[in-house]
Each structure stands twice: as structure tokens, then as C-alpha cells.
């Protein structure tokens, strides 16, 4: 895609985000994120075993839900939702249920697909098309909604409105919750399927990347435009300019993100536990949200080659070729 087209799409998205969130963003900056993380100690990323029960139940043909065991989750955010896409080789969800009842293992590997910030109903078809690309290759796909998104937002709120705000401590807690829930789902799936992979876009890429720094049993990992350096997005991206102004006025600087207490929330300051051969990173040469430089630094630290495409942040999501490339990688890796 030509640079100008990709650039314009990202700029239009910036305007659209500002318009949607205008007057909705709280100016409350909360407690110091460094002190907040310091107070958590070793509980920054609690293990699935510590968090306890997680048993999704089917509520419709596509939708599943369960109660999130995340401490402090309340309101609509207390309920975890996911859409499940049946592999092409299977014809009905009843087959899946009967297999579980028999205590057997699914022959199809599973994939957790994590969306980006501010996903709403008009964007759902995009992510669903990605899921179906993988499902057509015999992969069972689960697409959970991240905290404060879709059904997990409160009445009158924009989907994802509370996921990113001047309250940086709250933002980090949202990411921590997303990481914990992805690990809980993976643990649940590993008792039922042969292999489990994860694919995340942007914010979802941040969550997916962090799970690989905690668990070594992911069988395939695909990171699309992952937020490898959250501080770089906050202080450099035009997408969150309105948020940056409030954060700077509160006295927060980029130096605060260099604190050791924040390292476990920053992919570029953590090490993955996954073999590079099982990982794919896809990024756009023209991305105005997640800079190519931050992705390149992540690839060097983790020893992963980046599949660069001539796209920006938004045009990457709309392009079919990277989806096919990623689905082929996942099929090859999960069925290896």
C-alpha cells in the first residue's frame, strides 16, 4: 500500500478516536504507577493456579462466558466473554461438548485471538474473518474480549473507554487482568486440546507478548504490531495525544517507565520463554501508532525476524495478505 494512503488511514483513525472519546475521558490520574506496582510485589502476574476456577460456559452458538477470578473486577468487567470458532473439520459444537464429557483430548489445536484497543461492533467482522481464516485450517479459535471492552464496558461507555486513561495504574491493572485471563483460558484449553497458540493485535499483541514472558508452553505465537514499548506509544503516538497531555500535566514523564517495578509490563524489557521458531511478528513499515523502531528493538532482544509489510496500523488490519500469511504460519506451527 502507498505510504500516503497508509498514513492517511492512521491519521483518520486518530481523529475518530478523539471524536469518540471527547468528553468521556476522566482527568483523574490515580496513584503513582511506580508505587502501585511496587506495592504488588510478586503478585504483579499471579499464576492461573493462584487465581483459581475458570470454566467457560456456552450461552449462544458463538458466545461463551464465565466469571473472571481477577481480584477487584466488578460491574460488567467481572464477566469474561469470548467468541468460539469451530474448526472446518468439525460440524457442530455438540461434538466438542461430547468430547469434553468423555474426558478426551481435542484433535484440533486451539488459538487465542486477542483484539486491539477500542474494538466495537463495526470492527468485529474484521477479527471474525481472521478467526475464520484459522478455523478453515483446522484450528479452534477463541476470541476473548479484553477487560472493559464490548459487553465488559458499562452502560453509556464506549467499548475500551476505561482500558486507557490518565490513570496509568488502572491501565496497567487492565493489562495485568488481560494477561491473567489469557493464561487462564490457555490453561483450560490445554486440558482439552492438543496444542495452544496465541495471536494478538496492538493492545492484544502487548498482552500476548507478556504471556510469553511468563509461560513456556505456547505452541505458536503471532504478534501483530505489538505494543512493545507502552511508554513510546504514550509519549510519541498521535493516537493518544489527548491522553498524553493529561499524563504530563500530572507530572509523569517517560523516565517513570524506566523504573524496575515497571519492567514486567514492558515486552522490550523482558525476555520471552518461547523458541523463536514458534513466533511470528508482523508489523507495518508506515505504522503511526506502534513505531517500526520499537518492533525492531523487540525482534533483536527476542531473536525473532519481523515480517514487514507496506502498511500502517489500520491498513494492516484491513489487508488480507498478512492474515493469510499468519494463518499459514499458525497452521504449520500448531500442526508440526
Task: Give the positions of each predicted feature.
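N-terminal targeting or regulatory segments adjacent to alpha/beta-hydrolase or S9 domains
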Residues: 1-69, 95-102, 137
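Short beta-strand element of the alpha/beta-hydrolase
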Residues: 107-116
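Cap/lid segment of the alpha/beta-hydrolase catalytic domain
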Residues: 118-133, 141-176
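Hydrolase active-site cap/lid region
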Residues: 210-255, 308
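Catalytic histidine-centered segment of alpha/beta-hydrolase-like enzymes
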Residues: 312-323
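Short alpha-helix in the alpha/beta-hydrolase fold that links the catalytic acid
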Residues: 277, 291-299
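Short beta-strand/loop motif that positions the catalytic acidic residue
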Residues: 275, 281-283
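Acidic catalytic loop of the alpha/beta-hydrolase fold
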Residues: 285-290, 314-315
Amino acid at each position: 500500500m502507498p505510504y500516503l494512503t497508509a498514513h492517511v488511514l492512521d491519521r483518520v483513525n486518530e481523529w475518530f478516536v478523539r471524536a469518540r472519546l471527547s468528553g468521556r475521558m476522566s482527568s483523574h490520574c490515580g496513584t503513582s504507577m511506580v508505587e502501585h506496582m511496587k506495592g504488588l510485589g510478586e503478585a504483579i502476574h499471579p499464576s492461573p493456579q493462584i487465581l483459581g476456577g475458570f470454566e467457560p460456559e456456552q450461552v449462544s452458538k458463538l458466545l461463551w462466558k464465565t466469571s473472571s477470578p481477577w481480584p477487584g473486577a466488578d460491574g460488567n468487567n467481572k464477566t469474561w466473554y469470548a467468541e468460539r470458532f469451530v474448526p472446518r473439520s468439525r460440524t457442530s459444537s455438540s461434538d466438542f461438548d461430547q468430547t469434553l464429557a468423555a474426558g478426551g483430548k481435542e484433535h484440533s489445536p486451539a488459538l487465542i485471538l486477542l483484539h486491539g484497543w477500542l474494538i466495537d461492533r463495526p470492527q468485529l467482522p474484521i477479527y471474525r474473518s481472521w478467526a475464520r481464516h484459522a478455523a478453515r485450517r483446522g484450528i479452534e479459535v477463541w476470541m476473548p474480549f479484553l477487560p472493559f471492552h464490548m459487553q465488559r464496558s458499562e452502560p453509556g461507555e464506549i467499548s475500551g473507554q476505561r482500558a486507557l486513561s490518565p490513570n496509568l495504574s488502572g491501565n496497567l491493572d487492565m493489562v495485568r487482568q488481560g494477561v491473567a485471563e489469557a493464561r487462564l483460558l490457555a490453561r483450560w484449553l490445554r486440558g482439552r486440546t492438543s496444542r495452544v497458540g496465541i495471536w494478538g493485535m496492538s493492545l492484544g499483541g502487548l498482552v500476548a507478548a507478556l504471556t510469553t514472558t511468563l509461560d513456556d508452553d505456547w505452541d505458536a505465537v503471532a504478534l501483530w504490531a505489538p505494543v512493545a514499548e507502552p511508554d513510546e506509544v504514550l509519549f510519541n503516538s498521535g493516537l493518544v495525544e489527548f491522553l498524553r497531555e493529561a499524563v504530563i500535566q500530572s507530572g509523569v514523564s517517560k523516565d517513570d517507565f524506566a523504573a524496575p517495578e515497571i519492567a514486567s509490563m514492558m515486552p522490550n524489557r523482558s525476555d520471552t520463554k518461547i523458541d523463536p521458531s514458534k513466533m511470528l511478528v508482523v508489523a507495518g513499515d508506515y505504522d503511526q501508532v506502534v513505531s517500526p523502531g520499537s518492533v525492531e528493538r523487540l525482534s533483536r532482544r527476542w531473536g525473532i525476524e519481523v515480517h514487514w509489510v507496506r502498511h500502517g496500523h489500520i491498513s494492516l488490519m484491513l489487508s488480507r495478505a498478512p492474515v493469510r500469511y499468519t494463518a499459514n504460519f499458525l497452521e504449520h506451527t500448531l500442526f508440526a
